[in-house]
Amino acid sequence: MDQARDDIWAIEHRHSVRRFTGEAVPADVRAELERAVAAANATSGLHMQLTWDEPEAFKTMLAHYGKFQNACNYLALVGPKGPDLDEPCGYFGEKIVLLAQRLGLNSCWVGGTFSRKRTRCDVGAGEKGGR
């Protein structure tokens, strides 16, 4: 029941943030998020990837238009190509977003205001990014 209560708290307190402090995410927080992504990937068959300290993906005109500032950490939602990819990406991606909120990190879902070519994520043959 504590997990459900924690999730409700995170849902109530979560809001989109586009301006970040630029401070490094603490190692223990990174490790907990990495563990959660690995567990979600094992359960879902996705290939989600966390990238740390990489500002290039958000150095675009669209990111400037979207008012992103100091965005250099991100979760790439990647999985097997197919018509049903968006559902697991949304479900498991939101689980990671809520964990990040509980760990004191704000976030924002991003669709088209970043450069796919500039990301450090690995999209293999037969995979694509979720929307």
Identify the role of each PLM range.
Residues 1-131:
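Acidic, surface-exposed loops and disordered segments
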